[in-house]
Regions:
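An alpha-helical, amphipathic repeat domain used for nucleic-acid recognition
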Residues: 1-192
């Protein structure tokens, strides 16, 4: 479905909702008289208590535009999280790359609102991301303490949080053994 947005200041026409289609996923798609289609949360549409035959006010159009943007951002974030854990910083970057052309709403504010909601419902967690990322690096590659710490910080995990996660995986003896294992592996690879 293609969603088109108009700058509201350019729109001098009266806009009506021509049709409303409810989906099983809790969204509603509105077909407007200016040929736009907006998909947003059904509760937002219900909250406007807008009869279909009445023209939309400018403020109602702004709300619908903003909520349609929010729904697109939310769906994209959920699709990223369905594949693997992401840090909040990764999600911000990916969403801003995909939605940079939308001029009708403040994408950054909507991303922050969505991330806050995702964190409240435990769909996104930087701590969980850090644990899974560290576990992956320890099991798949010969990474040491400082390399993992640096990589976590590149993903937006604070040094303190990254250090706490690394401490969960082992003490100084664990990391020293890991470093020795890396050196042995490196020596084997250079001798062949």
């Amino acid at each position: 479905m293609e969603l088109r947005f108009l700058k509201l200041s350019d729109s001098q026409n009266i806009v009506n909702v021509e049709s409303v289609h409810y989906s099983n996923d809790g969204t509603v798609t509105l077909k407007l008289s200016d040929k736009r289609k907006l998909k947003l949360a059904a509760e937002v549409w219900s909250g406007l208590e807008q009869p279909r035959d009445n023209p939309l006010t400018d403020s109602q159009q702004e709300i619908l535009e903003r909520e349609a943007c929010y729904t697109m951002i939310q769906n994209k974030i959920l699709s990223f999280l369905a594949v693997r854990e992401h840090s909040a910083q990764e999600l911000r970057r990916k969403i801003k790359q995909r939605f940079y052309k939308i001029a009708t709403c403040d994408v950054s504010a909507l991303v922050e609102r969505c991330l806050q909601e995702m964190q409240e419902h435990d769909f996104q967690s930087d701590e969980r991301f850090a644990r899974l990322f560290t576990e992956s690096k320890l099991s798949n590659k010969p990474y040491g303490h400082f390399k993992i710490l640096q990589d976590l910080q590149k993903h937006g995990i604070s040094r303190e949080q990254a250090q706490a996660v690394l401490n969960e995986f082992g003490n100084q003896g664990f990391w020293l053994k890991k470093a020795v294992d890396c050196l042995v592996l490196l020596q084997k690879n250079t001798n062949h």
